[in-house]
Amino acid sequence: MKAVVFAYHDIGCTGIRALAEAGYEIAAIFTHADNAAENHFFASVARTAAELGVPVYAPEDANHPLWVDRIRGMKPDAIFSFHYRHMLNDDIINSASLGAFNLHASLLPKYRGRAPLNWVLVNGEQETGVTLHRMVKRADAGAIIAQNTVAIADRDDALTLHRKVCAAAGELLAEALPAIKIGEFSEHQQDESQASYVGRRTPEDGRIDWHLPAQRVYNLVRAVTDPWPGAFGYVGTGKFIVWQSKIHYDRAAAKPGTVLSVAPFVVACAEGALEIVTGQSESGVYMQGSQLAQTLGLVAGARLYNHPAAVAKRRTRVLILGVNGFIGNHLTERLLVDDNFEVFGLDIGSDAIGRFIGHERFHFVEGDISIHSEWIEYHIKKCDVVLPLVAIATPIEYTRNPLRVFELDFEENLKIIRDCVKYKKRIIFPSTSEVYGMCTDASFDEDSSNLVVGPINKQRWIYSVSKQLLDRVIWAYGDKEGLRFTLFRPFNWMGPRLDNLNAARIGSSRAITQLILNLVEGSPIKLIDGGRQKRCFTDIHDGIEALFLIIENKQKNCDGQIINIGNPENEASIKQLAEQLLESFERHPLRDRFPPFAGFREVESSTYYGKGYQDVEHRKPSIRNAKQLLNWQPTIAMDKTIDDTLDFFLQSVEPGDAEE
């Protein structure tokens, strides 16, 4: 049987050797180039491939069409992925006659995602394991072929557990690979109700919070100890690293972070105390805890901190223009949850952001971006990140007010972009799924899909083209003048505070708001062209989390990128959306306050939108970039989003409004 392998790290080497021992013909091995910033304590897949005489490649993007064609040309029977860091696209997965298989270092469906080995220790789990499963679109969600459990001892740390997991992987593959080779294996679907997800960990995640119980701090220390970057704390302005620790439950209670003794070096936590057995100062060498306490100049009663004591915290200042809008107000809520951000906002109204007025990290001015240009320029200069969210984005306005769409969406936003260039500020710009237009691809890819629009006399494309031209201008500024930017493309985000019913009354709202108005008023639901158009509906909370990760940009990998943010799993026609909404409406506790359902009515788009309208039959995103760059994927089902959105609007209707 011929296999193509994607592999990295010790588990990658384990998988490759297991394939060779099972008699597989390995046509090629794909791995990652070594990163000089990493601690290379693990074996080299490239060296293993060379020892076996197998061709090895380390492309920056294995999903590129050129590599896909080469892999197809190899005619593999199976694809195997062992600790490879990137998602593989459908073209690669489907290139093998038997399919693609991934070895994941957890007992799926728990701990899907990145760094499960560290996370199980952080969370104090008593067992983990390895899972061989089929590869599907969603990360780590395919049918399970085999699993092997690994017990986690109280004294295990990341390295000892890593070795156990590698051994378990070898045992599992020794049994599973021969069975796959002869086609005698079974598989079962994962229980989605038991699924959990974890994200990539960074060195910053090793920061010790002394206000946690000692058990939690101990778990963190062992989860990130050498050869990982280590858990760390601060004495004054100095940073120190904890490599080994021990829990003490018999110490008298004290304020968290208080040094209880220096020989041994024991620190109070919220529950119990932690002995620092070994550690080092940031610029020092590995040493015993008591020597570390002496080196740091500590005495009993001194305090340790989570941050450098003498350094004032510098929050990231985020400027949101259009802060009262659907995305703006939800994003503000998410940013204010994190103490690292301060929000400055401008909008012509404040009804959706009233809950933030008075918050110490929220600063709002009521104004119009076409008038308050001096205020905007000053705050672009003052802030770190700029999100210009002001735009006319309702389809009926594209044909009803095309010039206003161009003036606001293009001309006013171009001024903001130029100010970001002038003051060298990072801009996160809301592109749109509309830029793909009538693209014929099964799923729309940020880097390869064509952007296809209709003739000039179809004015509905003025929004799409205005946004596309701004995308191109931003890209050019990034290429020629060093503008830091990310373009994000929302795909049909839905949720509470999307538009309002008054906007729906004049036809200037998104589809679901218009449908809810029909139900509230007892008028027929209008299905434009029969409601055949398919869209992928995305919960606002999923979308905002992705946008937050772009702003946070922990890995510094979002600059110069275009990122689709949508939910390919939530694809439905407008008619299906209306039918699901009706079901939710009929079972809602407030149903009896509203008139009877008046039925569906099919309407031609030219009658509803005007002669300049042209529709798109389908619009499905590829979210490969979001998965790779953000370690993000949507999790919220469409029916929950519909329920939440409907409930918000029904709760907002005052008695008597439905009869107006």
From Swiss-Prot:
InterPro entries: Arna-like_SDR_e, Bifun_polymyxin_resist_ArnA, Epimerase_deHydtase, Formyl_trans_C, Formyl_transf_N, Formyl_transf_N_sf, Formyl_transferase-like_C_sf, Lipid_A_modif_metabolic_enz. Transmembrane segments: none annotated. The active site is at residues 104, 434, 619. Disulfide bonds: none annotated. Its EC number is 2.1.2.13, 1.1.1.305. Homohexamer, formed by a dimer of trimers. PANTHER family: BIFUNCTIONAL POLYMYXIN RESISTANCE PROTEIN ARNA, UDP-D-APIOSE_UDP-D-XYLOSE SYNTHASE 2. This is Bifunctional polymyxin resistance protein ArnA. It comes from Erwinia tasmaniensis (strain DSM 17950 / CFBP 7177 / CIP 109463 / NCPPB 4357 / Et1/99). The gene is arnA.
